[in-house]
């Protein structure tokens, strides 16, 4: 199934929502390290309160969940073999870009080389799913030949049966 431009853009948006929010969630959840309670139940409740009453954490979390919802909706009409590599690979790139913008160390030249190779690979996945007009014509021509061959085989088989039983 060929992916439309809208489907590809929706998957890129999902990757941006997932990858772009990860460094923000990491930074905002640093307050969890300071939470210390005597029992695991109180610890859990205090951690939930610390996270979900913190708008610095809550906004990226909600955006991340919007990405998950968009992914779910997009999967209904998109080929899974295209959706998974686009979202997962580009999410890593968006994580590195946003992390770098926030001042994190992203790993230097090797990370940049990895991002370039990832974009090239995703581009190949996307373009291989598109159907170029002349390839569609070749496919139709090939199907016609296959149908002709199939019909010929059926005629010969039915002729052989009638000779055997006739």
UniProtKB/Swiss-Prot annotation:
Bilayer disposition of the protein: Multi-pass membrane protein
Gene Ontology cellular-component terms listed: membrane
SUPFAM superfamilies: Multidrug resistance efflux transporter EmrE
Lineage top rank: taxon: Eukaryota
Membrane-spanning residues: 1-21, 82-102, 112-132
Primary residence: membrane
Keywords from the UniProt entry: Membrane, Transmembrane, Transmembrane helix
KW Zinc-finger (keyword) present: no
Localization annotation: Membrane
Family statement: Belongs to the TMEM234 family.
Designated name of the protein: Transmembrane protein 234
Species, as recorded: Pongo abelii
Gene: TMEM234
């Amino acid at each position: 199934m060929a992916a439309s431009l809208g489907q590809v853009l929706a998957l890129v948006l999902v990757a941006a929502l997932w990858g772009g929010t990860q460094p923000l969630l990491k930074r905002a959840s640093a307050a969890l390290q300071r939470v210390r309670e005597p029992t695991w139940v109180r610890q859990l409740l205090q951690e939930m309160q610390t996270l979900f009453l913190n708008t610095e954490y809550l906004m990226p979390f909600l955006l991340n969940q919007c990405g998950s919802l968009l992914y779910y909706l997009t999967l209904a009409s998109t080929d899974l073999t295209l959706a998974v590599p686009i979202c997962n690979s580009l999410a890593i790139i968006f994580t590195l870009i946003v992390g770098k913008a926030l001042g994190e160390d992203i790993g230097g030249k090797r990370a940049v080389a990895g991002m370039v190779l990832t974009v090239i690979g995703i581009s190949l996945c996307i373009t291989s799913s598109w159907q170029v007009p002349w390839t569609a014509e070749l496919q139709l021509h090939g199907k016609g030949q296959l149908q002709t061959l199939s019909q010929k085989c059926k005629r010969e088989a039915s002729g052989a049966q009638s000779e055997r039983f006739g």
